[in-house]
């Protein structure tokens, strides 16, 4: 718990501060996805604030329902005496700066601590001539369940609003973690909720946990996601129905600088054109029968974030022209209105159609096609990546098992049958098959016979071409991809894979466990 004050320049450029904050957010997101106790996670988040941004002596207080007050959940200090003294400190609603944040649910910013009589200085930790920021941590219902506070390492300056907004974003990230602590105090089961939190955080900030696959085609998809996520360019996701195009769009958003802004979805094929226009652009009061008040459309809802337009190939030529204008100029009018609305939205579109062919036939505007197709990502159908089916089956059964509250396993013979099927409905069909198999299984074990009852048969698809050998020294591979590639080259023999990676058998066994790699039987 080293709280040595970091050295940094007194005057900070806004762009530098913004870059530092983005890096810190990424670090905090990774921290919250780790398999650790909640108090350790909180302390590590406070360490990031202290070391990377000069937000010193961070403090997280958590609602204590038994006493109707806030108790200290974590504090960043190198003083063991201060840490021990904090154990009994509580703040009642309205008491001190922390209690005021709890009572009113608003952030409090002090330009100089000594100038504000509300500051109680119970911890004797903060410089009274320096600023202090405290922000609320709220649950989804909007109730304050904790407070995040820290002291900037410089006197009040023009960056105080930016620092405050940043702490509010961090407080939002911490909200679920703090909510778990409150639930534990209420006597709820902690382990399942902690696991759920980790899944949610990983789902948002690690696409490897959203999109499963280790074959070369999927590794190329992952590499494309990493590259394009850093840019604001429009992305066109191509693939058959059921391949997971929305998951790819979500992964792009949550790996991008827009991750803390909205991710809004719309299926263009689900609405008639008249409703589609209102849904995307919004409408003014009285624009049509039933429009009793003004309503923002999906573009406005996604302002600053990402708008995912699924089934983009289904929109009419007339509507294509309206969409093109928004992509070109970033502006539109609500239905029934004449006031121009400007938005900053990244578009990720998806289709199962061959848009290039549609352009040649005159069914899709060429200029819109090129606006959408700045970067195209093709998702391979499941029949082209059957080697991913064992890992996919494990992943999907884990998801189904959590939803149904029962453990599920699958036998090797069932996996072989699943790998022999052509899966015209792709991953969606596989998930449906596994859920039906789970329902029909007596003890949660999915056997070949159970899978056969769902209608899946051995179709013996043509053998895929041999997979090209992966360069284990490739720096674009992450740890999980590198270990899987080594295992594939070693025929899934751990000792042989360890030699390829320059590891001991114990080290690779630890990596396999911590990286959640499902070993294939040979």
Curated annotation (Swiss-Prot):
GO-annotated biological processes: nitrogen fixation; phosphorelay signal transduction system
Gene3D superfamilies in alphabetical order: 1.10.8.60, 3.30.450.40, Homeodomain-like (1.10.10.60), P-loop containing nucleotide triphosphate hydrolases (3.40.50.300)
Function: Required for activation of most nif operons, which are directly involved in nitrogen fixation.
Record region (A domain): 1-184
A Pfam short name: Sigma54_activat
Positions of the UniProt region annotated as C-terminal DNA-binding domain: 480-522
Keyword flag DNA-binding: yes
Keyword annotations: Activator, ATP-binding, DNA-binding, Nitrogen fixation, Nucleotide-binding, Transcription, Transcription regulation, Two-component regulatory system
GO function terms (MF aspect): ATP binding; ATP hydrolysis activity; DNA-binding transcription factor activity; sequence-specific DNA binding
This protein's record includes keyword DNA-binding: yes
Superkingdom in the source lineage: Bacteria
UniProt binding sites for ATP: 239-246, 302-311
Residue ranges of domain Sigma-54 factor interaction in the record: 211-439
Coiled coil: none
Membrane spanning residue stretches: none
Inter-domain linker: annotated segments: 440-479
Sequence ranges assigned to domain GAF in this UniProt record: 37-178
Subunit comment: Interacts with sigma-54.
DNA-binding region location: 494-513
Classification via SMART domains: AAA (SM00382), GAF (SM00065)
Protein's UniProt name: Nif-specific regulatory protein
First and last residue of the signal peptide: none
């Amino acid at each position: 718990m080293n709280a040595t004050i970091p050295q940094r320049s007194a005057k900070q450029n806004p762009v530098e501060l913004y870059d530092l904050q983005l890096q810190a957010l990424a670090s905090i997101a990774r921290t919250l996805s780790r398999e650790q106790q909640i108090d350790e996670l909180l302390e590590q988040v406070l360490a990031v604030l202290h070391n990377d941004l000069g937000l010193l002596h961070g403090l997280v207080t958590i609602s204590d329902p038994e006493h109707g007050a806030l108790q200290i959940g974590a504090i960043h200090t190198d003083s063991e005496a201060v840490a021990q003294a904090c154990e009994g400190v509580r703040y009642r609603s309205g008491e001190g700066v922390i209690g005021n944040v709890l009572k009113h649910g608003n952030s409090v910013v002090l330009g100089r601590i000594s100038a504000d009589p509300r500051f109680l200085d119970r911890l004797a930790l903060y410089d009274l001539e320096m600023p202090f920021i405290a922000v609320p941590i709220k649950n989804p219902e909007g109730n304050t369940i904790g407070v995040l506070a820290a002291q900037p390492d410089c006197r009040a300056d023009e960056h105080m609003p930016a620092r405050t907004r940043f702490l509010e974003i961090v407080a939002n990230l911490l909200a679920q973690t703090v909510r778990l602590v409150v639930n534990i105090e209420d006597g709820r089961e902690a382990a399942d909720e902690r696991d759920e939190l980790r899944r949610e955080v990983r789902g948002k900030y690690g696409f490897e946990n959203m999109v499963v696959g280790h074959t070369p085609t999927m590794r190329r998809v992952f590499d494309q996601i990493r590259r394009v996520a850093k840019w604001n360019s429009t992305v066109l996701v191509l693939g058959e129905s059921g391949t997971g195009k929305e998951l790819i769009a979500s992964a792009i958003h949550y790996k991008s600088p827009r991750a803390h802004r909205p991710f809004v979805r719309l299926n263009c094929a689900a609405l008639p054109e008249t409703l589609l226009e209102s849904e995307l652009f919004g409408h003014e009061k009285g624009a049509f029968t039933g429009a009793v008040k003004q309503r923002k459309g999906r573009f406005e809802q996604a302002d600053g974030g990402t708008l995912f337009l699924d089934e983009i190939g289904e929109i009419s030529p007339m509507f294509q022209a309206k969409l093109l204008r928004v992509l070109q100029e970033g502006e539109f009018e609500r239905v029934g209105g004449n006031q121009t609305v400007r938005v900053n939205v990244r578009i990720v579109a998806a289709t199962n159609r061959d848009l290039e062919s549609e352009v040649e036939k005159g069914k899709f505007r060429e200029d819109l096609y090129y606006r959408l197709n700045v970067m195209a990502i093709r998702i391979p159908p499941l029949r082209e990546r059957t080697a991913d089916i064992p890992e996919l089956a494990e992943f999907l059964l884990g998801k189904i098992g959590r939803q149904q509250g029962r453990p599920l396993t699958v036998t090797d013979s069932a996996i072989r049958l699943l790998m022999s099927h052509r899966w015209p409905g792709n991953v969606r069909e596989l998930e449906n098959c596994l859920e039906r198999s789970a329902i029909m299984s007596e003890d949660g074990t999915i056997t070949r016979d159970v899978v056969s009852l769902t209608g899946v048969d051995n179709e013996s698809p043509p053998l895929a071409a041999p997979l090209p050998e992966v360069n284990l020294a490739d720096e674009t591979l992450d740890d999980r991809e590198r270990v899987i590639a080594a295992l594939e080259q070693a025929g899934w023999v751990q000792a042989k894979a360890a030699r390829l990676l320059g590891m001991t058998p114990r080290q690779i066994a630890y990596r396999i466990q911590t990286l959640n790699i499902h070993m294939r039987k040979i």
